């Protein structure tokens, strides 16, 4: 699948100091890139009330993604208690 990153997502990941967490994010991005469809992505769940918004769970953190026109946009990254206030 084609993958793109928003500036917000890139800034949130750059601020991270936890290298293990950065590695988990990289693994999630890799799994999206090799997936043939959304059903092939592990830990993916559709957000209710939104047609194109999904989240990927990585421990206590969530990656907010948008799926539009066969492109996956990595849009946000935050702790599980904060992600739903800022995304989508």
Predicted regions and their residues:
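A short, compositionally biased N-terminal segment around positions ~18-40 that is enriched
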Residues: 19-38, 76
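A short, surface-exposed loop/turn module that caps and links secondary-structure elements
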Residues: 30-57
């Amino acid at each position: 699948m084609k993958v793109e990153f928003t500036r917000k997502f890139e800034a949130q990941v750059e601020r991270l100091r936890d290298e293990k967490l950065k590695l988990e994010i990289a693994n999630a991005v890799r799994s999206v890139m090799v997936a043939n469809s959304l059903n092939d992505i592990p830990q993916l769940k559709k957000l209710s009330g939104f047609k194109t918004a999904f989240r990927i769970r990585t421990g206590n953190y969530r990656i907010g993604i948008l799926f539009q026109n066969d492109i996956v946009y990595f849009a946000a990254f935050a702790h599980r208690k904060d992600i739903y206030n800022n995304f989508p």
